[in-house]
């Protein structure tokens, strides 16, 4: 929210810390206590993830996602909410929802078919297969997959290029 109102912000970067980008939503805090009411996962998504996806999509400046490792579930879909996604060649994307009986959330059912086509989106969503960053780039799901050793430099160059552009018109 602070970045939205800051005129000095020219581009927004979303990335992970450590070896992975984002393993997705932590469902452990959604466990039902003995005798307790079922947790409404839909309400949780509406409260926690939908506002983040909408904020990314409505930023007045370009949004870049730098995927530095595994992007699973909601993590993969948060990446897809950004304008440009660049990933290390060792990164991967996994629509892991089917493994736990959930429908892809955080914009997954919206973005996947638009980026990779209906058949591929259905396959990714129903099978939960790991998609390499290189395959994701070949399918048009992300902008590019970069050698791990050159990743930081490539991201910095991309950010500088976007920040130097007329960002309101991009």
Where are these regions (language model features)?
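Short glycine/serine/threonine-enriched helix-capping/active-site loop
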Residues: 14-16, 170
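Conserved hydrophobic packing residues within short motifs/helices of P-loop NTPase cores
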Residues: 12-14, 64
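Crotonase-fold acyl-CoA enzyme core
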Residues: 7, 54-168
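Glycine- (often His-adjacent) and acidic-residue-rich active-site loop
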Residues: 1, 8, 16-55, 71, ...
